[in-house]
Amino acid sequence: PTKLKSDAVDYECELAVVIGRTAKHVKKENAYDYVGGYTVANDYAIRDYLENWYRPNFRVKNRDTCTPIGPWLVDAKDIHDIYGSPMNLSLQTTVNGKITQSGHTRDMIFDVPTLIEYFSAFMTLQPGDLILTGTPDGVVNCEVGKVIVTSIEGIGDLINTLGE
């Protein structure tokens, strides 16, 4: 189980982009050439550690067990061959079998090429680096013992049970 000490833990189903080769100053039109694959990320947020607008929320996201990924890595070519783009995938979260999030990658604020262009402009992306792409509406507080399943079409189901 994912173990977190908090009264306010939210889940976030996100497409995780896995960088496949070193990327620096990449243009959007070439961005997919740098993707090795895709996986599911559950980017838990511990909301009782939220500070304020003027301080980074480092403690909200950066905790042991807070960002499980999986269930496996799907090769970028497979996603592009079958779906045309990672921007054509449905996302869903269930909590104890009840659908709580349902969305689509085409509705993301920034598409994958935009994110790669942006980040590679000021940092070198290395093979294995992850870019998490954002979550659809429907995030709710989780409780100990709840089973959270974050799913992305063409990738799979990531299953976590929230522990203390």
What kind of region is each of these model predictions?
Residues 12-13, 19-21, 25-42:
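RNA pseudouridine synthases
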Residues 1-9, 23-30, 57-61, 75-82:
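A generic local secondary-structure boundary/capping motif
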Residues 3-5, 13-15, 19-23, 93, ...:
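Hydrophobic beta-sheet segments that form the core/acyl-binding groove
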Residues 47-164:
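Catalytic-pocket segment enriched in acidic/His residues
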